[in-house]
Amino acid sequence: MRGLRQGIMKQLPILEPGDKPRKATWYTLTCPGDRPCPRVGHSCSYFPPVGDAESGKIFIVGGANPNQSFSDVHTMDLGTHQWDTATREGLLPRYEHASFLPSCSPHSIWVFGGADQSGNRNCLQVMSPEDRTWSTPEVTGSPPSPRTFHTSSAAIGNQLYVFGGGERGAQPVEDVKLHVFDANTLTWSQPETHGSPPSPRHGHVMVAAGTKLFIHGGLAGDKFFDDLHCIDIGDMSWQKLGPTGAVPVGCAAHAAVAVGHHVYMFGGMTATGALNMMYKYHTEKQHWTVLQFDTSLPAGRLDHSMCVIPWPVMSTSENKDSDSVILTLQDEKGDAAEKAETQSGGPHEESPTTVLLCFVFGGMNTEGEVYDDCLVTVVD
């Protein structure tokens, strides 16, 4: 089956700063500096520019390899295209955790749960944007039990949503409650929901698009799920969806991001190996598409992490009255969307335009090879 190959792959083209990426193409980014070592279970988040900065940064938090779990934070500056170490202070080592940036403090990164070699966690930690140190704030309400819960896309506004997760080995927690953490009030709650929630699972993707949370796949014991569920936080009603199109196979340890009305899903594992396919789901039409690429595909992988980043390119305006479209990343409501502005330029004036890329870092195959590569492809 196409997409199940995980061995030696052809080298992908390199996307250089300022280059305009082509659609239906996977690229690698090769940035110098203090890059993260190969790892799995890390989180990957895009931070918008702070203060006078023109470009944002990608933050890679935690993760693990077969020998240890990490408490480091690495950043990729999208202006200088260099890696750096942000901090090693205060973060408890963890992997397969959740991360989010609340709208009340969009330059603070929160992490929840995950595990290290000694067991699962259920604590929350936050990194201050001023001094880049981590703290463990006191919270109220009943937190979820300790669990792995690997996502960077399950937040809407100030609230992180937690469903399911890993207990031990291939077994999920039996809890099917929806847990909500509010970063503004520092409170956990378990709102009453309606309908039938998904069965217990871990390794599923949970991604917010607008006011809806979508859950796909996951694992319980040796059973891989291929179902798709949705809950709208407006009425708190669970729905099991029956989408059309190229429905993905049952898988776990994959990753997903939302861009407008689309959810992009990449990678994961099945009983036969690691996947390197990308799917697009239209949340309004409830339709799946498997994306076709003009170039080689990345190596199949699982337990990687993804986020959506803006990528500036330079275009030359031949007409002073011509308009260039500028896309900006909007994640105020927990999803990435596109906002168009127009900008007029003089004859032959270079003006910046921005495209949105899905950024993928790390992961591993089912043969034990752990990756430290950076992959990108255009999403729209």
Swiss-Prot record:
Gene3D superfamilies: Kelch-type beta propeller (2.120.10.80). GO terms for cellular component: endosome membrane. The keyword Membrane applies. This is Rab9 effector protein with kelch motifs. InterPro entries: Kelch-typ_b-propeller (IPR015915), Rab9_kelch_effector (IPR052124). Rab9 effector required for endosome to trans-Golgi network (TGN) transport. Its main location: cytoplasm. Pfam families: Kelch_KLHDC2_KLHL20_DRC7 (PF24681). Interacts with PIKFYVE; the interaction recruits RABEPK to the endosomal membrane. Interacts with RAB9 in its GTP-bound conformation. The lineage of its organism: Eukaryota, Metazoa, Chordata, Craniata, Vertebrata. Kelch repeats lie at residues 57-103, 108-154, 159-211, 212-258, 262-311, 357-380. It is found in: Cytoplasm; Endosome membrane. The keyword NADP does not apply. Phosphorylated on Ser residues by PIKFYVE. PANTHER family: RAB9 EFFECTOR PROTEIN WITH KELCH MOTIFS. Keywords: Cytoplasm, Endosome, Kelch repeat, Membrane, Phosphoprotein, Repeat.
